[in-house]
């Protein structure tokens, strides 16, 4: 029997190596390894379509191999944000699927956001069980980069559909999701796929203190997600008397890959989606990439125009310049380790109860 510490450590190491060898024989190579054998590399991400939100997420977008939840009130931009993620994935040559449990996907609107609808795989399942089985098959194929489920509230259990209208089905949906997510978590990671759940908000009954809002589907989704995004409409964008879009705020209420509680603000324009040009102007001016003198904006001593809308029109017509400015902004975010993410009201966010 070994008595000195070095011999004891050697014996332990031999025993561990033997155990690892047996595990690899039983479950295949890669089932277990030391961390140094698989060094932590830069997280592979897909952009959200918003520069500010990519920065607020801390890693430059949504991380692959993770489960994401986007939740918020009605007409706040949840589906719009998810469709932008699909469009960005398709730009990289990725394959995407949309599980339309609400049976409400607007194909024409999706095209306007840049989604290649001809290449988009779509399913309109009849029950929640069917939806989760379809997702499992798609994930296990390892061919799909992004899967969006719209929405959790519409994942109706089979027993509820087959039952009578007035029947009580307490906790059925929560159990369905809990069981489904247990199976999906590991396969999503292995397939390096982003699984996005769109969720709705409900009010808790009888809550006097604290936040009365909660999301549908029980608590399982809150635990299994790596990122939870709370999206809200905070104002209207007007062109004279006509409302042309919404000012939108997204709070990163949970983040397992970077510091949470950051927030991003951007515009969602009707029939256009996230206004990337608006972000380029606002963030570019804030970071000094664009020079602003009064209402005039300049870039590299070239005057872009007077007023935000005129500059947007100029950048729309000169896409190369817009792309160059965007690249400089993203490089600045990377170099500053994302510390300049839009984090207004950070202290207030930390005090709020995160459900």
From Swiss-Prot:
Q: Where in the cell is it found?
A: Cytoplasm
UniProt keyword list: ATP-binding, Cytoplasm, DNA damage, DNA recombination, DNA repair, DNA-binding, Nucleotide-binding, SOS response
- Give an example GO molecular function: ATP hydrolysis activity
Chain positions recorded as ATP binding sites: 72-79
The record's annotation in Gene3D superfamilies points to: P-loop containing nucleotide triphosphate hydrolases (3.40.50.300)
Q: Does the keyword Amino-acid biosynthesis feature in the UniProt annotation?
A: no
Q: Give the record's GO biological process terms.
A: DNA recombination; DNA repair; SOS response
Residues in the signal sequence: none
Q: Name one GO cellular component term.
A: cytosol
Q: Does the keyword DNA-binding apply?
A: yes
Name of a matching Pfam family: RecA_C
The record's annotation in NCBIfam families points to: tigrfam_recA
The task this protein performs is described as: Can catalyze the hydrolysis of ATP in the presence of single-stranded DNA, the ATP-dependent uptake of single-stranded DNA by duplex DNA, and the ATP-dependent hybridization of homologous single-stranded DNAs. It interacts with LexA causing its activation and leading to its autocatalytic cleavage.
Q: Which family does it belong to?
A: Belongs to the RecA family.
Q: What is this protein called?
A: Protein RecA
Query: From what organism does this protein derive?
Result: Wolbachia pipientis subsp. Culex pipiens (strain wPip)
In the UniProt record, the gene name given for this protein reads recA
């Amino acid at each position: 029997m070994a008595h000195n510490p070095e011999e004891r450590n050697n014996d332990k190491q031999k025993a561990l190596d033997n155990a690892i060898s047996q595990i690899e024989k039983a479950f295949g190579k890669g089932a277990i390894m030391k961390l140094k054998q698989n060094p932590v590399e830069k997280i592979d991400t897909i952009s959200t379509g918003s520069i500010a939100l990519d920065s607020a997420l801390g890693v430059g977008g949504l991380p692959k191999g993770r489960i994401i939840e986007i939740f918020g009130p009605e007409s706040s931009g949840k589906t719009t944000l998810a469709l932008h993620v699909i469009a960005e994935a398709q730009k990289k040559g990725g394959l995407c699927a949309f599980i339309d449990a609400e049976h409400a996907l607007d194909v024409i609107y999706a095209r306007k956001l840049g989604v290649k609808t001809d290449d988009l795989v779509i399913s309109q399942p009849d029950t929640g069980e069917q939806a989760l089985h379809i997702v499992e098959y798609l994930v296990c194929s390892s061919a799909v980069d992004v899967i969006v489920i719209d929405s959790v509230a519409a994942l109706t259990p089979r027993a509820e559909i087959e039952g009578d209208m007035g029947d009580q089905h307490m906790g059925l949906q929560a159990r369905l999701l809990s069981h489904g997510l247990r199976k999906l978590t590991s396969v999503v990671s292995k397939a390096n796929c982003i699984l996005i759940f769109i969720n709705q908000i409900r009010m808790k009954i009888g809550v006097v203190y604290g936040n009365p809002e909660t999301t549908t589907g029980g608590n399982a989704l809150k635990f299994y997600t790596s990122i939870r995004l709370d999206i809200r409409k905070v104002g209207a964008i007007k062109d004279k008397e006509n409302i042309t879009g919404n000012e939108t705020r997204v709070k990163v209420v949970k983040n397992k890959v970077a510091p949470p509680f950051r927030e991003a603000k951007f515009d969602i324009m009707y029939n256009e989606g996230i206004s990337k040009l608006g972000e380029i102007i606002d963030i570019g001016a804030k970071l000094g990439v664009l020079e602003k003198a009064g209402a005039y904006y300049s870039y590299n001593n070239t005057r872009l125009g007077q007023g935000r809308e005129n500059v947007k029109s100029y950048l729309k017509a000169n896409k190369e310049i817009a792309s160059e400015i965007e690249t400089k902004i993203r490089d600045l975010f990377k170099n500053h380790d994302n510390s300049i993410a839009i984090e207004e009201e950070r202290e207030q966010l930390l005090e709020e109860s995160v459900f």
